[in-house]
Amino acid sequence: MAYVTMKQMLETGVHFGHQTRRWNPKMRPYIFGARNGIHIMDLQQTVKLFRKAHDFIADNVAKGGKVLFIGTKRQAQEAIAAEASRAGMFHVTHRWMGGTLTNFQTIKKSIDRLKKLEEMFEDGSIKRFPKKEIVMMGREVKKLNLALGGIKDLNGAPAVAFVIDPKREQIAIQECRKLGIPVVAVVDSNCDPDMVDYIIPGNDDAIRAIKLFASHMADACLEGAARRKEDKAMEAEETKAAEKAVETEAKEETPQEAK
């Protein structure tokens, strides 16, 4: 179990909030103070709340749940996509399409279109179309992949959403709340913490800070997946042992019945 440490947070600038004039008063409990007009986050609380969020995600994945990583701001895109992929989870790193979760069946049609086009390019059947159409379809694939590539294997609602900057991702969070999907989020000093179920107070703008949080949340997913694999293996062994015991008992009873 690899929790993020206070040293790592300090090194990546997690403690730096926004300018004091841009703060949300609801974040007061998570702010240590101010320096040069910048709010400083209380990292003791961040460490504690991060561990709580980490365990929540690991537990959900251990039960078979999937996590949707959301971070569409430029600074977050690369880290969110890379870490979600490393963990075998889903991600949205470009503009959130309204209805991605609440109107998933409509979004699914676009995903199916993307998969069909990719298959045609892969097996060569695309060659039966005129060159002009092939170029247009190639552009369509690129556009659809940009918007939906990170969720094209998503078959239903995720168990948890991990969000960078809930202020920017308000529409995504509203959809999660409507569907009862718990939200874990990195919440900066200018955000409303009431929108989030599991708050991680910290810098949601610095690339290194975002990468730190995303990588550790990916680790939480991998930890949960490993636990699930172990539980399944243990369950299979117990089932096998029980079947063997029943078989042995049946063999022992057979001679007595014969008498």
Swiss-Prot record:
InterPro entries: Ribosomal_uS2, Ribosomal_uS2_bac/mit/plastid, Ribosomal_uS2_CS, Ribosomal_uS2_flav_dom_sf
GO molecular function: structural constituent of ribosome
Keyword Ribonucleoprotein (UniProt): yes
Chain intervals for the UniProt region annotation (Disordered): 232-259
Disulfide bonds listed in the record: none
Residue intervals passing through the bilayer: none
Biological process, per Gene Ontology: translation
UniProt entry keywords in alphabetical sequence: Ribonucleoprotein, Ribosomal protein
Record's GO cellular component terms: cytosolic small ribosomal subunit
Family according to the record: Belongs to the universal ribosomal protein uS2 family.
Protein name as it appears in the record: Small ribosomal subunit protein uS2
Organism for this UniProt entry: Maridesulfovibrio salexigens (strain ATCC 14822 / DSM 2638 / NCIMB 8403 / VKM B-1763) (Desulfovibrio salexigens)
UniProt gene name: rpsB
